[in-house]
Amino acid sequence: MARVTVEDCVDKVPNRFELVMLAAHRAREIASGSALTIDRDNDKNPVVALREIAEETQSAESLRERMIESHQTQIEVDEPEEDQMALLMGSEVDRPVQDDMSEEKLLRALMEAQGQN
């Protein structure tokens, strides 16, 4: 195939606009270092992408899926911390009560509770 045109690929991807989108996506993949599935033959990336589609070394369906995935973004929603949530809702922060019981006092209280004094 000396010259690749859109006509050579229309039987693989009937919609010309979709074909252009898929070929452009594949050309960007090639530019970013993706491995070629055919010989370059001194052609530029868009021509190589069209040749890959025409020779069906890249399926239109897999290109379509990769193109869709590349356009999808996931936005993380920051959830407020529990302490901040309580304050936002107008209630007090649920924290343990501060006590001044030392370890020794705690052990004595436990021993007394068990009756081993």
Swiss-Prot record:
The keyword Nucleotidyltransferase applies. It catalyses: RNA(n) + a ribonucleoside 5'-triphosphate = RNA(n+1) + diphosphate. GO terms for molecular function: DNA binding; DNA-directed RNA polymerase activity. Its EC number is 2.7.7.6. GO terms for biological process: DNA-templated transcription. SUPFAM superfamilies: RPB6/omega subunit-like. Keywords: DNA-directed RNA polymerase, Nucleotidyltransferase, Transcription, Transferase. GO terms for cellular component: DNA-directed RNA polymerase complex. It comes from the Bacteria. Pfam families: RNA_pol_Rpb6 (PF01192). InterPro entries: DNA-dir_RNA_pol_omega, Pol_omega/Rpo6/RPB6, RPB6/omega-like_sf. Gene3D superfamilies: 3.90.940.10. The keyword Signal does not apply. PANTHER family: DNA-DIRECTED RNA POLYMERASE SUBUNIT OMEGA. Promotes RNA polymerase assembly. Latches the N- and C-terminal regions of the beta' subunit thereby facilitating its interaction with the beta and alpha subunits. The RNAP catalytic core consists of 2 alpha, 1 beta, 1 beta' and 1 omega subunit. When a sigma factor is associated with the core the holoenzyme is formed, which can initiate transcription. Belongs to the RNA polymerase subunit omega family. This is DNA-directed RNA polymerase subunit omega. It comes from Cereibacter sphaeroides (strain ATCC 17025 / ATH 2.4.3) (Rhodobacter sphaeroides). The gene is rpoZ.
